[in-house]
Amino acid sequence: MPDQRQQERSRRKQGEPSPLPTPTRHDPPPSEQESPVRRMLRDLRERDPGQEAEEEAAQRRQQRREQSGE
């Protein structure tokens, strides 16, 4: 009977997911992923979907104001 490491190696070759948890590179921890402000806005958005359009419109107005001010 092959030992566990041997089984692990053959399993990897076959392309089956490893039983050991491997960190996915494209999914960093939340602290790196988004700032607290982003998280807060997202929580608000999830609670009130209608808010999202208003926030985006407000951001666009803000950007336009900044651009015209320059």
Swiss-Prot record:
Q: Where is the composition biased (Basic and acidic residues)?
A: 1-15, 24-50
Q: Which molecular function GO terms apply here?
A: protein tag activity
Asked whether the keyword rRNA-binding is assigned, the reply is no
Q: Where does the record put the Isoglutamyl lysine isopeptide (Glu-Lys) (interchain with K-? in acceptor proteins) cross-link?
A: 70
- Name the UniProt key words of this record, in alphabetical order: Isopeptide bond, Ubl conjugation pathway
Region listing for Disordered, in residue ranges: 1-70
Similarity field: Belongs to the ubiquitin-like protein UBact family.
Q: What does this protein do?
A: May function as a protein modifier covalently attached to lysine residues of substrate proteins. This may serve to target the modified proteins for degradation by proteasomes.
Q: Write the protein's name.
A: Prokaryotic ubiquitin-like protein UBact
Annotated organism of origin: Terrybacteria sp. (strain RIFCSPHIGHO2_01_FULL_58_15)
